């Protein structure tokens, strides 16, 4: 689990451990995340933009999940570097499956029109969204044996407090109908969707909405 210390990463680690998986939680500074070790994960330091680090940490694993983020670096540079290093490192480690936590602003509202393309889309969110868009292009253009999938939650703020319901919808590259409806989608249920796709893959080499 790369980016295990973030909001999505922490929930994914907890969900995977609860299901009986052995999980390696990769963060830049393990001392900041003792709760991950307390969950039962193997907490290690690593760098998702370094293919050698990825390969060494991923060896012996069946799958990888990336929920990495760096707010102190240009998003377009960081996400491209991470995508390239993850594909390279996981390929060398013979890890066949990678799930990536994307962003809902990449989903289409109509054919060829993404959320981030809409008039009035906030400038302060554009650079981060374009970073994820560049990441997706790296994945789509890669000649790789790694079977990747990018899951994009609704283009709204996810619920950090709500508990796990185990219920979600998934599929397609468009914003799910009523995705911003009465029941906010939670990080806990995003984690359920991620681990379900690790255990029972149903989508491959595409961007899909989840919510």
Where are these regions (language model features)?
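Conserved beta-loop-beta element that borders a ligand/cofactor-binding pocket
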Residues: 137-159
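Glycine/proline-rich active-site loop of Rossmann-fold NAD(P)-dependent oxidoreductases
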Residues: 144-145, 158-166, 197-206
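Conserved Rossmann-fold NAD(P)-dependent oxidoreductase catalytic core, especially the SDR/UDP-sugar
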Residues: 22-24, 30, 84-127, 141
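Substrate-positioning beta->alpha
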Residues: 131, 183-195
